[in-house]
Amino acid sequence: MTNIHPTAIVEDGAQIGNNVTIEPYAIVKKNVKLCDDVVVKSYAYIDGFTTIGRGTTIWPSAMIGNKPQDLKFKGEKTFVEIGEHCEIREFAMITSSTFEGTTVSIGNNCLIMPWAHIAHNCSVGNNVVFSTHVQLAGHVQVGDCVTIGSMVGVHQFVRIGSYAMVGAMSGIRRDIPPFTIGTGNPYALGGVNKVGLQRRRVPFETRLALIKTFKRVFRSGESFQDSLGSVLEDFGDVPEVRHFVEFCRQPSKRGIERGIDCEASLDEPIDKKEGAFVES
């Protein structure tokens, strides 16, 4: 049963699914679509051609689908699509896109914490966590299963690869390769996101191949392109390694981040099920 509080404003034309809850003083504009089981909490504001996926909760004072903060925007018809079972927390802002027919998209099962900002033409994958005050400029692409710590600023057109973990208070100016962990301003790669991969049940052999890939690409002294080719020869049967190489070879407006934290440990993982430390 849908429950809309009398003080909420839901404009004619808005599409409201089954079992939707809209709390006091929330505002839902005419072109919005709320799928089944969505909860819109008090004072939230949802505008534009915005679709909120099933089971997602929009927390108080979040703003979604409003005009992009981009001087190039001329009133074109653009879209926001938020997936299923997301949590968009207090005061988060997700603006609409720029240029006719384009979309700001967020995948399923994402947690967007308070005061995060996702700008025009961004795309965010599934199972992503943005901590408080994460700020994405326009055209940023974030892969699946990425975690970004508090107060991180991301330059426009940057790509952040799947399973990456970005430490708090970092400044991101270049593309972050998938499966990596790092921090800092300027940013420095610390190695492979070993703990994150283990939590996601990535097999031990895959994690080991990724660690050896990281060492070869960033610490061997080989040229960047030569090292990408050599890891494909040695570990090309591992899908995650192929994905890493493909990401690094894709066209990029910002370039790949290659700064390294030389003090970071690149020891191979210890896996309780696999036994003791594995030497390289």
Swiss-Prot record:
Protein name as catalogued:
Acyl-[acyl-carrier-protein]--UDP-N-acetylglucosamine O-acyltransferase
UniProt keyword annotation of Lipid metabolism present: yes
Q: Tell where it localizes.
A: Cytoplasm
Which species expresses this protein natively?
Chlamydia muridarum (strain MoPn / Nigg)
The similarity comment for this entry is:
Belongs to the transferase hexapeptide repeat family. LpxA subfamily.
Pathway connected to this protein: Glycolipid biosynthesis; lipid IV(A) biosynthesis; lipid IV(A) from (3R)-3-hydroxytetradecanoyl-[acyl-carrier-protein] and UDP-N-acetyl-alpha-D-glucosamine: step 1/6
Catalysed reactions, semicolon-separated:
a (3R)-hydroxyacyl-[ACP] + UDP-N-acetyl-alpha-D-glucosamine = a UDP-3-O-[(3R)-3-hydroxyacyl]-N-acetyl-alpha-D-glucosamine + holo-[ACP]
> Which superkingdom does the taxonomy of this entry point to?
Bacteria
